[in-house]
UniProtKB/Swiss-Prot annotation:
EC number: 3.6.1.15, 2.7.7.48, 3.4.22.66
Residue positions, PTM O-(5'-phospho-RNA)-tyrosine: 428
Pfam family membership, one: RdRP_1
Keywords per UniProt: ATP-binding, Covalent protein-RNA linkage, Hydrolase, Nucleotide-binding, Nucleotidyltransferase, Phosphoprotein, Protease, RNA-directed RNA polymerase, Thiol protease, Transferase, Viral RNA replication
Protein name from the UniProt record: Genome polyprotein
Upper taxonomic lineage: Viruses, Riboviria, Orthornavirae, Pisuviricota, Pisoniviricetes
Keyword ATP-binding: yes
Length: 1214
């Protein structure tokens, strides 16, 4: 066999040499570790040869079934029958070999199968060690002891596996019991050993109490007996009930009161786990029809006691039998079933009265002490246990009890009694529906009392009627259908759930059906698009994910066999390696985006590390082609099929296994591969085509669109006729106009390409683990003032909330108002919005494309000289409409509460809100840092943006429209210009919907991550919400940080961390000096404003140069020569602009106003033909104060200014 490669599972070699490899060989240790050696003899042949020398062996010495052979399995590393290898390699005859183990041919074959499965499984599910017991007896007593244990197993319905000898043939699946071996004294057994002193097989009727221990004469504690008889590995749920397999009941409980439920469940738990039953009891109290599902979910995450307890629950929705001992088994059925019988504690295998038993037996001292302590604490535990459970339940009920809310003047003084009750949305709907259907004049207070009486199990007629009505309502809500099934088992009626239950959420606002998911645990990404895959008998196998249009993906070993998804078989099942793609008639209301990049998060949002290199791995389900990763999440059986996502939140792989007990952090990930399922897409408008060739365009990798879209030339900014001679004195000029501009001859295309270069690479951002922690902290902080919101129902109302003066995006030319006439949308816009909305309703991502342009604005002269000009990202009107429908109310809530939070979007810097900022700036013993950032938009890490969008989603109703908006905004933006489409690798487009809020959330997340990292690098473990210790003002890239001394001491490290994240923090004056705290006697600058205290109060002063340049330039018709004054001036608008400039200038003092502003105004009136009077200084101050305090209406250019700056955003953006 030299040179041959063995490819079979099992290799059997025969040899006539007792020692195939000499013990002195270098390869002896490696060889004997890898083989099992069986010595084969034929006793009949040897005896014949001994008794009849020289005669032929007769045929009767051989049998066709090989039963004539005697098989002796050697111990590990036994190179001969007498000795094993010496680990030191010095004297190989110094260690005697253990006696060989006698096995049968069937046992040897089964041992080979078990050994092969164990050795070849790189990825397995986690499981605990199963207890092993051995009963040592004489060789002639093995059959007697085996039969006695088999009889006692049948008598008590035990769960253990019984074997003769050392060979174990049963697999350790969930629900299996302990391993019990009947062995001889020669066997080298590892486990708990009990020596049999006598063996007397008694009749089955006499196998009561301690009889099996007396019959065997073993010294064995009651705890060991319980573990041996009733140990259960893991947790298993059986929906198919077989009466012959059910354990005998110890307790029967009818589910109608909380006390009975709490008392029954208490028996199954340890003291450390009894608190977990409180929530289960409350849920069953409120939703009795869901008792079976609630118990399944509760059992899945509960630690059970080491005592053996069997309880039968009789609920309105069915019957549940729960057996627990270390693990648990449960049988659930929709029928009314009473399991007869019941082995009492006195009649169990542990025996009857402990110290006064009729039969004497040997009791170990540990057992005597344990029984004594149990006897002492018996009465006290009965009283104290009930008290603790009911006390905790009382607190739990008080937590969910509706509270009355004060109004008006009593808002902050507590609620007055009898002033009303605040209902939840569900309770309000129930009250209205019950009152309408029953035609009752029922008040809210009466309804709540009736609801709680019914939930607590009251038996009066009103409570009984309400329970019946509520059960029917819940059944309709879960889309249950009462059907008649005719099969081999006869005719039966069952409740079939037609709609899927959503995965469980960790939110008190979730619907009750969210509490009873059948597998997906809390925190799984894209849980609305995940559905359970079940076996034909209802057992959970794994998960499938909806990727749109009724197409699902899962794993081959999950959907193999008789798998059912949403109560139907998969159709058009296609396998790509281990990945399974199929169709279903039942389509989930939302879907997930899929891609082929590298994952950074596991299904629970924890960071995953992987080289993303694929090969075949041996698993318990065969060879699987995938990649190996590492994650801190603990997985379990049934998690296969859950998604791994990249930094954009796109599903790129599915969970296929873990490293088991040896390496639980090791994960096997199956990558996504695209399969053509002949899906007809619902969205026709898209410029970037994946199947079109990629070309290089002026150094950028782009795809051709076939539709040339040129960059707009010229500018609408003109020099004022009052300053044709001295405009060079102004610090700003219109941005570069392209190749013909003598100030900077770079073409507009060149400027565009230069601006897009930073978007070709993504910034690294914070590490995923820290980012996840800080995201939870920020979400928790915002929950105090941001409320949950609902999605807009139609695209019409969402569209009319948009700014109609902005671009329609890459698919339709012009502005939005150009396509609306008398409030009616034209056909082009209507068709586009309709197609986008129909796709968004399916939860699918929209094409994330923008029309690119260059901003027409004033720029500092030094930036004009080098051709620096900012980009305009014109968002698709369809994407804007969908995002407005999804997040409009959330954004309004954040903007309305800017005084309470960190995000200052929506603040009016020319109003009393500035006073609130000033108060927050004056926190004692805190340092203040003013920070600005260079190239903020292009340095935004995609994973941080994705996390910010998830925070916004947290405060929505998580509808398919929201899922579509999130998937769209998380995807890579596409920029369209000059007939090409450029895909952004990293960064945040300035024209993206909610760009100011998302930028501000990014700002908070990265500053928080930098602070946490700096503190922990310094040895301070951050175990609190970091946002409770600091205050922030963020508006996009502008930031002010108010931090305590602890954080201030590590601020240099914070800014260093921000640079590692890819950001470029600078001082507000853009200098290269180190960022230092602002002294207490110096003003703080925020949003281009200086916040100071003046004689008129707290004011946010606009920069003087920003005010002065208002007089130098006028916005008019488009031109290539901006140095020539415009032909026509809109004098009313221009007069209002300069009047506003006077008001802002008045806040800088009379000297500046009189010496600088009044001459500029007078000259503008003279040369521009304006019809305004120069406001006197005190009049200007009084007018601004009136606007500030809200006593006078604000002019248009103040009221409609963007960015909170207070002046025209078109001219005054820097």
């Amino acid at each position: 066999n030299k040179g041959k490669t063995f490819t079979s599972k099992y290799v059997i070699m025969t040899s006539n040499t007792e020692t195939p490899v000499k013990p002195t060989s270098r390869r002896a240790g490696a060889f004997y570790r890898r083989v099992m050696i069986v010595d084969v003899t034929n006793n009949a042949v040897e005896k014949w040869k001994s008794d009849n020398p020289g005669k032929a062996v007769p045929k009767w010495c051989f049998n066709k079934d090989f039963s004539h052979l005697s098989l002796s399995l050697r111990g590990t590393e036994a190179y001969c029958k007498e000795y094993v290898l010496d680990p030191t390699g010095r004297n190989h005859q110094s260690r005697r070999a253990p006696p060989p183990q006698q096995v049968t041919l069937e046992q040897l074959a089964q041992k080979m199968v078990v050994q092969h499965t164990t050795n070849t499984s790189e990825f397995v599910t986690q499981a605990g060690d199963v207890p092993v017991f051995g009963f040592v007896c004489q060789n002639n007593e093995i059959d007697t002891v085996y039969n006695l244990l088999a009889a006692v197993k049948a008598r008590y319905g035990a769960n253990f596996n019984l074997y003769k000898g050392m060979v174990r043939t049963a697999h350790e699946n969930s629900g299996c019991g302990a391993h019990v071996h009947v062995i001889s004294r020669e066997d080298n057994f590892r486990g708990k050993v009990f020596t049999v002193s006598r063996s007397r097989l008694e009749s089955v009727p006499h196998l009561e109490g301690d009889s099996f221990r007396r019959s065997l004469g073993v010294v064995m504690s009651d705890k060991d007996v319980t573990t041996m008889f009733y140990y259960i590995k893991g947790k298993v749920i059986n929906d198919q009930v077989n009466l012959t397999e059910l354990p005998a009941n110890q307790h029967v409980v009818t589910v109608h009161t909380v006390y009975d439920m709490a008392w029954a469940l208490r028996r199954h738990l340890k003291w450390s786990g009894q608190w977990q039953l409180i929530k289960a009891a409350f849920e069953i109290m409120c939703y009795p029809d869901a008792a079976a599902c609630a118990l399944r979910n509760w059992m899945d995450s509960t630690d059970f006691s080491e005592e053996h307890v069997v309880t039968q629950f009789i609920a309105p929705g069915g019957t549940i039998i729960l057996e627990s001992c270390h693990g648990a088994r449960m049988w659930a059925t929709g029928k009314r079933l009473i399991r007869a019988g019941g082995i009492t504690e006195a009649g169990g295998p542990q025996g009857g009265v402990r110290f006064a038993g009729l039969g004497a037996r040997n009791v170990p001292w540990s057992e005597i002490l344990r029984e004594f302590m149990t006897l002492i604490s018996h009465i006290w535990s009965q009283i104290k246990g009930a008290t603790v459970v009911l006390t905790a339940l009382t607190f739990y009920l008080k937590r969910f009890r509706p509270r009355i809310e004060a109004k008006g003047k009593n808002k902050n003084k507590g609620a007055r009694k009898n002033t009303g009750v605040a209902l939840t949305d569900d309770e309000y709907d129930e009250w209205r529906q019950y009152r309408t259907e029953k035609n009752l004049d029922l008040t809210v207070e009466d309804f709540l009392q009736l609801r709680h009486r019914a939930a607590m199990g009251a038996d009066d007629s009103d409570a009984v009627k309400f329970r019946c009505w509520y059960s029917e309502r819940q059944r309709n809500y879960h889309d249950l259908e009462d059907v008649t099934i005719i099969g081999r088992g006869g005719v039966k009626r069952e409740l079939i759930r037609k709609g899927p239950l959503r995965p469980r959420g960790n939110d008190y606002y979730d619907e009750p059906d969210d509490w009873y998911s059948e597998g997906v645990i809390d925190g799984v990404a894209h849980k609305n698009a995940i559905v359970s895959v079940d076996d034909v008998d209802g057992m959970h196998k794994g998960y499938a994910i909806h990727i749109g249009h009724g197409v699902y993906i899962s794993l081959k070993h999950v959907v193999s066999g008789n798998a059912r998804i949403l109560s139907e078989e998969p159709k058009n099942l296609t396998f790509t390696g281990e990945l399974a793609t199929f169709r279903l008639n039942n389509i989930l209301p939302t879907a997930v985006p899929v891609g082929t990049s590298k994952p950074i998060k596991d299904p629970w949002g924890n960071p995953v590390s992987t080289d993303w290199q694929f090969k075949n791995y041996n698993t318990t389900s065969g060879n699987i082609y995938g990649a190996c990763g590492s994650s801190c999440s603990l997985t379990r059986q049934g998690d296969c099929g859950l998604p791994y996502v990249d930094d954009h939140g796109v599903v790129v792989g599915l969970h296929a296994g873990s490293g088991g007990d040896k390496c639980p952090s090791r994960k096997l990930i199956v990558p996504y591969a695209k399969v053509d399922m002949r899906v007809r897409d619902t969205c026709t408008k898209q410029c970037y085509k994946d199947n079109s060739p990629t070309i290089s365009y002026k150094g950028l990798l782009v795809k051709e669109t076939g539709e040339p879209r040129t960059i707009m030339k010229g500018t609408r900014l003109h020099v004022s006729p009052a300053h044709t001679d001295d405009y060079e004195e102004c610090t700003h000029q219109p941005a570069s106009l392209g190749a013909g501009d003598p100030r900077c001859p770079i073409s507009l295309t060149g400027i565009m390409v230069n601006n897009l270069q930073p978007y070709t690479e993504a910034s690294p951002g914070p590490d995923t683990a820290t980012l996840n922690r800080v995201s939870k902290m920020l979400t928790s902080h915002m929950e105090g003032y941001v409320q949950k919101s609902q999605t807009e129902e139609g695209y019409g109302s969402a569209f009319y909330m948009l700014n109609h003066d902005t671009s329609c995006g890459p698919y339709i030319g012009g502005r939005k108002k150009d396509h609306v006439k008398d409030g009616v949308l034209d056909k082009n816009l209507l068709d586009l919005l309709s197609s986008k909305w129909n796709r968004a309703k399916l939860g699918l991502a929209l094409p994330h494309e923008y029309a690119l342009g260059l901003k027409d604005e004033l720029r500092p002269k030094d930036k004009v000289a080098v051709g620096k000009r900012r980009l305009i990202w014109g968002c698709d009107v369809g994407v804007s409409t969908v995002c407005r429908a999804a997040f409009k109310r959330v954004s309004e809530s954040i903007m309305a509460n800017h005084a309470l939070g960190f995000i200052q979007v929506g603040i009016n810097m020319d109003g009393p809100a500035v006073e609130d900022l000033f108060k927050r700036l004056e926190r004692p013993k805190h340092d203040r840092y003013c920070v600005d950032y260079s190239k903020w938009d292009s340095t935004q890490p995609p994973k941080v943006t994705s996390q910010s969008i998830d925070i916004l989603r947290h405060f929505t109703d998580k509808s398919p429209i929201v899922d579509s908006a999130c998937a769209t905004l998380k995807s890579n933006p596409i920029g369209i210009f000059n007939g090409v489409a450029f895909k952004v690798a990293g960064g945040l487009p300035s024209g993206m919907p909610l760009t100011s809020i998302i930028n501000s959330l990014n700002h908070c997340l990265m500053v928080g991550s930098a602070v946490v990292k700096a503190l922990e690098d310094s040895g301070v473990q951050v175990s609190w919400n970091i946002f409770d210790s600091m205050d922030l003002f963020t508006y996009g890239d502008d930031g002010v940080y108010i931090v305590p001394p602890l954080i201030s001491s590590v601020m240099p490290n914070v800014f260093a961390n921000l640079k590692q994240f890819g950001l470029k923090p600078t001082r507000t004056d853009k200098s290269d000096a180190e960022i230092t705290p602002i002294p207490a006697d110096e003003p703080v600058e925020f949003l281009k404003r200086t916040i100071v205290r003046t004689e008129n109060g707290i004011r946010a002063l606009l920069d003087r140069s920003s005010i002065i340049r208002q007089f130098y330039y006028i916005k008019a018709e488009n031109t290539e020569n901006w140095t020539i004054p415009p032909k026509k001036i809109d004098t009313p608008s221009r007069g209002q602009q300069l009047y506003n400039a006077c008001l802002y200038a008045s806040q800088h003092g009379e000297e500046f106003y009189t010496n600088k502003i009044i001459p500029l105004v007078q000259r503008a009136i003279e040369f521009e033909g304006l019809h305004i009077e120069v406001p006197e200084f005190h009049h200007a101050v009084a007018a601004y104060n009136g606007y500030f305090n809200g006593t006078e209406g604000q002019p248009n250019q103040i009221a409609f200014a963007s960015g909170g700056l207070g002046l025209s955003s078109e001219v005054f953006e820097n």
